[in-house]
Amino acid sequence: MANAIIETAKERFAQSHQSLSREYASIRAGRANASLLDRIQVDYYGAPTPLNQLASITVPEARVLLISPFDKSSIKDIERALNASDLGITPANDGSVIRLVIPALTEETRKELAKEVKKVGENAKIAIRNIRRDAMDDAKKQEKAKEITEDELKTLEKDIQKVTDDAIKEIDRMTAEKEKELLSV
């Protein structure tokens, strides 16, 4: 039963890491990356639809994204969604495809993005600590219900803290890696 609490916490930590990884992938680092467009929703026939379901996204050059809509009639909707997004990149529509030229990051923009990375990393740490709190509460409930002894509770709490520390170290590593990527020219 005690192992189930730790396994559940580990699974939730892994989900947090995956979520953080996706979040970091969508923060542009001066290079074209199709994951920059993962959060773009296009109003397609009145329904919000993810861009990657309406078009193929390729990277023909280091700083260029090429969006080729499956349905050419959706090109205006896609362009409208890109203009409305917070990417800060103006799409170039040539009638059949849309080109996004990723501008080189200025020093100021790099620092702003690094701050954003730290903020996102801090939010991930908060999520990890909330998961730890839930696991500790579950352990205390088991001890109250006399399913585990007080000594087992102390051991379980130490184990939960150890996996929590490991999860936070991983977040710190991911954050430092993304910051390094952003700040290197």
From Swiss-Prot:
CDD domains: RRF. The keyword Cytoplasm applies. It comes from the Bacteria. It is found in: Cytoplasm. One of its GO terms (molecular function) is ribosomal large subunit binding. Pfam families: RRF. One of its GO terms (cellular component) is cytoplasm. One of its GO terms (biological process) is translational termination. Keywords: Cytoplasm, Protein biosynthesis. Responsible for the release of ribosomes from messenger RNA at the termination of protein biosynthesis. May increase the efficiency of translation by recycling ribosomes from one round of translation to another. Belongs to the RRF family. This is Ribosome-recycling factor.
